[in-house]
A protein has these predicted regions:
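Short, flexible, surface-exposed loop segments at domain boundaries
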Residues: 2-7, 17-204
Length: 204
């Protein structure tokens, strides 16, 4: 069945929170898929995306899987490497929409500040936490090559960890955010998947 696909994300934005060390077809557009797994059939993953469409995503031996688990603001320390989708404030600071904490092995992933489409006007900042003020507005200073951003983290903003995972995480009902390539024939092939563990919804 022919489907319109309305969940395309900027490839550079997705690169901000997913490992990109996967061989890619040079001419395949990069897309993002957000939704819930409805079924697994071997290397085929059936997903109902957030816009309501049903899509089939193919996995390869190179598809990387990360677990997304709950975290707390107290888990973030100076020197932690994080990513945050956020909205701009009039004073030049950012207000976080979500925070994801990378494992040490992924430090440096997507370093920088760029546009993102989690919400209209949002940005993605990936970098190393410098100053961390929890008692006064929960404000993080995130430093990256060429700049830094001050990010205010409201109490209700989801904070998660990205952890090593495997295909055992991929089962019906699991919420996923993935980075994929869409071939000329419409085939979608996952390159990196962030899968919610224990009912967690990846907030990216």
């Amino acid at each position: 069945m022919k489907m319109t696909f309305n969940t395309m994300l900027l490839a550079s934005s997705l690169a901000a929170f997913m490992t990109l060390g996967v061989a890619q077809a040079q001419d395949a557009p990069r897309i993002g898929v957000r939704g819930a797994i409805t079924a697994m059939d071997g290397d085929a993953m059936h997903v109902k995306v957030n816009s309501g469409e049903d899509v089939t995503v193919h996995l390869t031996k190179d598809t990387q899987v990360r677990a997304v688990t709950l975290a707390k603001i107290e888990d973030i320390k100076p020197g932690s490497y994080i990513g945050s989708a956020a909205m701009p404030n009039a004073d030049g600071t950012l207000t976080a929409l979500e925070i994801h904490v990378f494992p040490p092995a992924m430090a440096g992933t997507g370093d920088g500040h760029r546009a993102f489409d989690l919400k209209e006007g949002s940005s993605m900042t990936n970098g190393t936490v410098g100053d961390l003020v929890v008692s006064n507005g929960r404000t993080l200073t995130v430093k990256y090559k060429g700049g830094e951003q001050k990010i205010v983290v409201p109490d209700d903003v989801p904070i998660v960890n990205l952890e090593p995972g495997d295909r055992s995480l991929l089962k019906a009902g699991v919420k996923v955010v993935m980075f994929a390539a869409k071939g000329a024939d419409g085939t979608i092939t996952a390159q990196a998947i962030s899968a919610g563990k224990d009912g967690v919804t990846p907030p990216m």
